[in-house]
Amino acid sequence: MRVLGIETSCDDTGVAIYDDQHGLLTNQIYSQAKIHANYGGVVPELASRDHLRKIVPLIQAALSEARLQAKNIDGVAYTAGPGLISSLMVGATVGCALAYAWKVPNIAVHHMEGHLLAPMLEINPPSFPFVALLVSGAHTQLIAVTKMGKYQLLGQSVDDAVGEAFDKTAKLLGLDYPGGPMLSKIAQQGIAGRYKFPRPMTERPGLNFSFAGLKTFAANTINIAASDAQTHADIARAFEDAVVDTLMIKCQRALDQTGFKRLVMAGGVSANQTLRNRMKKMVEQRGEEIFYARPELCTDNGAMIAYVGSVRFASLVLPQSQLAVIVRPRWPLEELTTISR
C-alpha cells in the first residue's frame, strides 16, 4: 500500500510517500524559517499562506521523485492536529480533496504520534514496550508505549516546552530564529562549570517538567554578565547542560517506574547532538537500548505522517470519520485508538 503523507501543523511543509513493501519512497520538506526569522517566531497567517503556495509543488515533486502517478496512490494521510489551526486546515483540505479526486481513502493523523513512531522508519526500529521522550517546540512529554496506538502519559511540562525554552534563551543571547540549534552550536565552545544553572523539578518526585524558570534564570544571568562571545558561549553551555541533565534524570525515573528496557527520543529537540550523546551513554550504562530517528525525520515531516497513515489504514482503525475535514488544534495523544497489528 502506498500512502501520500501531508504535514502542515506549523511552519514546515512536508510531503512524503510511504510504501508498506518498500519503505519510504520520497520525503519532500520546505522550511519557512527564513520567512519567520524577521519576527522572532512563527506568524500563523504567514505560515498558512506559505503552505498554500508550496504544498501542490511539493506533492508534484514527491510523485515525480517516486516515479508514481496519482493512480498509484492507495491512500492520503494528513496531519489533523495538534498545531496551528490555519496551518492544519491547509494540509487537511488538500489531503481530503486529493483523496476524493483520486477515489482513495483519507485518514487524519496525530502529529505527535507521527513523531513518536518516526524511529520505526529506521533500519533498526524499536520493539515494544518502550518509554518515549517527546521533545519539541510545543511539547515535552514522557509516554509509556506498550503497542502502536496505546499510549500512557507519564509526565509533561507544566509550562514552557523544552524547544520553546531553547528558542527563547537563544533570542536573549541575540541569536537568530530558530535559535535552538544555534544555541547548541555556540554551547560547544562554552566552558563547562563557569555558570551553574538549576535542574528544575529534579529534587522532587514525579515525571513532570518545568522550563519557564530555567529561561528566567538564563535571562537574569545574561543581564548581569559580560556580552562578549565567550561569555555567551559559556551561558549557552550551562543552559544546555541543565536541560540535558533534567531530561536524563526524568528519563531514568520513567525507565525505573515502568521497568521498560528501551528509550525512544522523538521530536525536533531529539536531533540535538549533545542530548543524543549523553542520553545514549546513560542508557547503555544501564544495560538498556535507545532509539531515535535520523535528524531530518526528527523535525516536522511528511514521512512520519505517511508511515502512521499506512499503519492505521492496514489495521482499519481510523481516528475519525472519513466523510469530513476535521482538524484538532488540541488533541490529547491518549485519545487515539489502539492499533491491532
Swiss-Prot record:
What keywords is this UniProt entry annotated with? Acyltransferase, Cytoplasm, Iron, Metal-binding, Transferase, tRNA processing
UniProt keyword Transmembrane helix present: no
A GO biological process of this protein is: tRNA threonylcarbamoyladenosine modification
Q: What does this protein do?
A: Required for the formation of a threonylcarbamoyl group on adenosine at position 37 (t(6)A37) in tRNAs that read codons beginning with adenine. Is involved in the transfer of the threonylcarbamoyl moiety of threonylcarbamoyl-AMP (TC-AMP) to the N6 group of A37, together with TsaE and TsaB. TsaD likely plays a direct catalytic role in this reaction.
* Residues annotated as binding Fe cation: H111, H115, D300
Origin organism is Baumannia cicadellinicola subsp. Homalodisca coagulata
Give me the residues that bind substrate, please: L134, V135, S136, G137, A138, D167, G180, N272
**CDD domains associated with the record:** ASKHA_NBD_TsaD_bac (cd24133)
Its needed co-factors are: Fe(2+)
Principal subcellular localization: cytoplasm
Catalytic activity reported: L-threonylcarbamoyladenylate + adenosine(37) in tRNA = N(6)-L-threonylcarbamoyladenosine(37) in tRNA + AMP + H(+)
The UniProt similarity line reads: Belongs to the KAE1 / TsaD family.
Q: Cofactor comment in the record?
A: Binds 1 Fe(2+) ion per subunit.
GO CC annotation? cytoplasm
Q: What gene is this protein translated from?
A: tsaD
Q: Kind of enzyme, top EC level?
A: transferase
Subcellular localization is given as: Cytoplasm
The identity of this protein, by name, is: tRNA N6-adenosine threonylcarbamoyltransferase
Q: Which GO terms describe its molecular function?
A: iron ion binding; N(6)-L-threonylcarbamoyladenine synthase activity
Q: Give the E.C. number(s).
A: 2.3.1.234
